[in-house]
Amino acid sequence: MVGFGANRRAGRLPSLVLVVLLVVIVVLAFNYWSISSRHVLLQEEVAELQGQVQRTEVARGRLEKRNSGLLLLVDTHKKQIDQKEADYGRLSSRLQAREGLGKRCEDDKVKLQNNISYQMADIHHLKEQLAELRQEFLRQEDQLQDYRKNNTYLVKRLEYESFQCGQQIKELRAQHEENIKKLADQFLQEQKQEAHKIQSNDGKELDINDQVVPKNIPKVAENVADKNEEPSSNHIPHGKEQIKRGGDAGMPGIEENDLAKVDDLPPALRKPPISVSQHESHQTISHIPTGQPLSPNMPPDSHVNHNGNPGTSKQNPSSPLQRLIPGSNLDSEPRIQTDILKQATKDRVSDFHKLKQSRFFDENESPVDPQHGSKLADYNGDDGNVGEYEADKQAELAYNEEEDGDGGEEDVQDDEERELQMDPADYGKQHFNDVL
């Protein structure tokens, strides 16, 4: 300002400058007013924006919280979805298994239907078989009743025939003992005659007696053998012929075809009684030595050995025939007398042969075993060219028969004892037809 007002006076301002200053002040005031108003507006906007920011922050916090909750929900939903998928997989596998079971059940159903049809056919067939079996059962019941009737009939017939056999056995025994008595009387008479002849003859006639007595010894042996063979050889065949002549043993109404039904009898009736020949042989073969009387307590059927010691009695087993035969235990006194006579005959024959043997060995000087005196040396006619009497030979043969087999009785007894040791059923099959 100093430059402009150099040629002016001091203290004085120009009007232009003043106007300009005024204009500048006005402009500045207007600017200040506009700026202040604008500043106020901006502050209001800032306050509004701060309020909006606060609201957005609150909304943001709420949104974040909501977002976190939604994320949790999403996680839970994901877990549920995974679980559902796993459950779906399990259910699908179960469904497949059920479908497989359903198919198998269908197959089993078809098989069961087929089996039911087969079983129905089998049931029908079994019903038919049951009806047939019932008919067969009824038929067999009828047969059983017929068999029972036949059994009772056969039992009665067996009892009757066994009674008839018992009667015939009693008759045959009586005949047999009468024959034994006759033979015993005849033998005693012959023995008395021989004793009388021996006593009447002198010692000078020994040579004649050597020829006569051995001729009588075979007769005695033959009589004893005939007496012993009669109960075994002639006793039972005669009974058989009598039974076979009658055919049905006094029952004409019985057919011969009924004999084939004997195998159908029960085992108790199948065992036939012991044959009569066995019973007679056991009664007649019992030997009693001389010089020893029977004790009163000893039964008549007890056997006595050759040494004089009583042996064990051989008893026949009990049988239905023996129980049915009345009076089977007959008196055995004639039989005991016959045995005593037989033993006496044997003793006399043995004494005679001992005497004859001593004389024979004195003449020929042939040794004899002293331990086996009963067995003579074998005959050999070329030793020393010494002739022998025919009567001596026959006496030796008769003596050997007496010592070896007792006239064949011991062999028969051994055969019968072997038969007794057999099974009674086998024995019955062999001898049942003989008894009938």
UniProtKB/Swiss-Prot annotation:
Membrane topology: Single-pass type II membrane protein
Intervals, Cytoplasmic compartment: 1-14
N-acetylmethionine sites (modified residues): 1
Comp. bias intervals (Polar residues): 275-295, 305-321
GO cellular component: membrane
Highest taxon above the source species: Eukaryota
Location relative to the cell: Membrane
The keyword Transmembrane helix is annotated on this UniProt entry: yes
Extent of Basic and acidic residues compositional bias: 193-207, 224-247, 344-362, 426-436
Span list, region Disordered: 193-436
Lumenal side: 36-436
InterPro entries xref list: GOLM1/CASC4
Recorded coiled-coil stretches: 35-195
Location of Phosphoserine modifications: 233, 275, 328, 332, 366
Family named by the database record: Belongs to the GOLM family.
Protein name: Protein GOLM2
Source species taxonomy: Eukaryota, Metazoa, Chordata, Craniata, Vertebrata
